[in-house]
Amino acid sequence: GNYANVIQGHDNINDVINSPEPYLSRLIGRYGNRIANGRFQLHGKEYYLPINNGPNSLHGGKKGFNVKVWDAELMNNQSLVLHYVSSYGEEGFSGELKTTVIYTFNDDNEFIIDYLACTNKKTIINLTHHAFFSLAGIANPTPTIDTLECELNADFYIPIDETSIPTGEILKVEGTPFDFRKPVAIGKRINDDDNEQLKNGSGYDHCYVLNKKEE
């Protein structure tokens, strides 16, 4: 194989600010994915979040971590450390949240992201990174990912409703277009018009339950 840059991104902060894609390879918080109807309950109290995706709150709200300017420092020649303090009540979430993210590119050609967070009040949190991959390389991108093969060590997936909220079920992938236990081209079954889940997600936009041995 060839060495290539496979993660899409921006060259400077002005391109980030003016990007039409608000989540392109950005940090996501305080809560990645959707929260139904922009509300949640915690210890008997209900919290209300900004609605920014149909009837739901997505990726931390209208001004989530993806639009924040983080403090940055080099830890060594392999790691970049990012810091951000989310104030109490920011985007409707409880507690002040101090977040540290460490990007590491090591000698084994691994890119590792570590997330650390500390709050002064009970809250909910689901940090992630919204990387956009172009596996053929940024310099020579493929027009679609339909021909790329995917393999997932997962016997189950989580179905969603028509607004992309998990239904609470955990279903078997066997016999469905969601079965990637053996390598399959992504585009082979993505246009299955008879599959309600593919319609709900406009393709694959689901969580998988990865198989993992008990430690």
Model-derived features: positions:
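An exposed, glycine/acidic-rich loop-and-rim segment of catalytic or binding clefts
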Residues: 1-215
